[in-house]
A protein has these predicted regions:
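Helical element adjacent to the flavin cofactor pocket in flavoenzyme catalytic cores
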Residues: 73-129
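Mid-domain catalytic core of redox enzymes
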Residues: 116-231
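Rossmann-like flavin
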Residues: 2-67
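Glycine-rich phosphate/pyrophosphate-binding beta-alpha loops
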Residues: 56-61, 172-174, 245
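FAD-dependent oxidoreductase catalytic-site/capping-region signature
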Residues: 223-254
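Glycine- and acidic
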Residues: 54, 78-86, 245-254
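General beta-strand structural signal in soluble alpha/beta enzymes
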Residues: 50-51, 111, 143
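Redox-cofactor-proximal catalytic regions of oxidoreductases
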Residues: 1-18, 59-89, 230-239
């Protein structure tokens, strides 16, 4: 399709694919590289560039207008070289597999026990104090609540300069439509995931309004291949767009 629609770019695109395949995307020591700069070494058509970045940014970039080249490579391989798939039960199947591996390695999962604070001793994290007062010690702690939120929980011997990470600019809003029929009956039977952009240039940044509907992702889970006789119990259509977090949090609950 690239050769047909962008004939002057096909050689550069093939060079980009070769660069992606040869890049060590699991190296922890790789320097930070701009994906925009990396792509422009091979592709100089702005439309093709935007078409490459729209899916990869929506599925794998936490920064505005650009992403790290290593993350670009991971997402490029996953989306363009490997393709999309979805278990019938969704991400729960993957989570159960990961949990089984974790438990087999000696891990323990605790649910419904929030973290009250993170204790730092000697300049590093030493323990978690849970909401019920229980102390859990650890040599390493991985937090998934966000950098600013994590830093607000840290108490004790904190090195100078810690606790100053600003919140990111990107946020999203997602609508899920539950239908009493298959989306294919409404004419939506040919696609599983559609990435769209109707602007002259793809603008992956915090919108000025509540929601930026110029670009986004449309996902129709019913259209994935689940095997003979297997189907979702109801029709689903998910639409994801960029949103402005501060405007949403300022809205009344009702």
């Amino acid at each position: 399709e690239v050769a047909a629609r962008f004939p002057t770019q096909i050689d550069g695109f093939r060079a980009l694919v070769a660069a992606v395949r040869s890049f060590d995307d699991v190296s922890l020591d790789a320097p930070a590289l701009s994906a925009r700069e990396g792509v422009r070494r091979h592709v100089n058509d702005p439309l093709l560039e935007d078409m490459l970045f729209c899916p990869l940014m929506y599925y794998g970039s936490a920064t505005e207008r650009d992403m790290d080249f290593g993350q670009f490579v991971i997402m490029f391989k996953a989306l363009f070289l490997e393709g999309f798939a979805r278990p019938l039960e969704g991400v729960r199947v993957i989570l159960r597999t990961l949990l089984a591996k974790y438990r087999a390695a000696g891990g323990e999962r605790r649910m419904k026990c929030g973290v009250r604070r993170i204790e730092a001793r000697g300049g590093r994290v030493a323990a978690l104090i849970l909401d019920d007062g229980t102390e859990v010690t650890a040599r390493q702690v991985i937090s998934s609540i966000g950098a600013p939120e994590t830093e607000r929980l840290i108490t004790g011997d904190v090195p100078n300069g810690q606790g100053t990470t600003p919140a990111g600019n990107l946020s999203f809003v997602e609508t899920i439509s539950v239908l009493n029929r298959e989306p294919a009956e409404l004419g939506w039977g040919g696609d599983t995931i559609v990435f769209f952009n109707d602007s002259e240039r793809f603008d992956y940044s915090r919108p000025q309004e509540d929601v930026d509907t110029r670009s986004g992702v449309i996902c129709i889970p019913n259209n994935f291949e689940y095997g003979a006789g297997r189907r979702l119990p109801e029709g689903l259509v998910r639409v994801t767009c960029l949103a402005r977090h501060d405007r949403w949090t300022a809205m009344p609950e009702e």
